[in-house]
Amino acid sequence: MKAYLLLCFLGLSTLSIAQSAVGTWKTIDDEDGTEKSHVVIYEENGKLFGKVEKLINPEQTICTACKGDKKDKPIEGMQIMWGLKPDGSKEWKGGKIMDPKNGKEYKCKIELKDENTLNVRGFIGFSLLGRTQTWYRVVE
């Protein structure tokens, strides 16, 4: 009986991991299709946050366009996504995302399309006024 319960628990744990946006994601530029960075999405106090782990062939490594405490700081290690709250089993909304290229902040929502594909939408005002990038899970 204990072995059965353990197997059930492990199965549920695996299912919840597969349905989570937590992990490392390869970002793809929606304008030219090139790989730009790896972003680590992590959970803290029930919300999702994202931090740049690695830049791929960077045009810039310092966020000169950023404002506030991010101004003139390295992009690697920088938090660029914050405050996303779960909205169903595969969506998170209500957060913000910052584009290090121009330093602008946008409202953000993300949707897990499958265990290795994440749609990240940044927008102003309404979700219709924005753009979506597709990120891919880094599988090591």
Tell what function each PLM region has:
Residues M1-L5:
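Positively charged n-region of N-terminal signal peptides that target proteins for export
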Residues L6-S13:
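Bacterial N-terminal signal peptides
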Residues T14-S20:
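Sec/Tat signal peptide C-region and signal peptidase I cleavage site
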Residues S20-T34, Q133-E140:
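K/E-rich alpha-helical interaction surfaces of small helical-bundle regulatory domains
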Residues D29, T34-D99, E105-Y106, E140:
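Central antiparallel beta-sheet cores of small beta-barrel/beta-sandwich binding domains
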Residues D30-D32, P100, E111, G125-F126:
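Short polar/acidic secondary-structure junctions
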Residues E44, K113-D114:
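Structural motif
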Residues E115-T117, I124-E140:
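Edge beta-strand at a domain terminus
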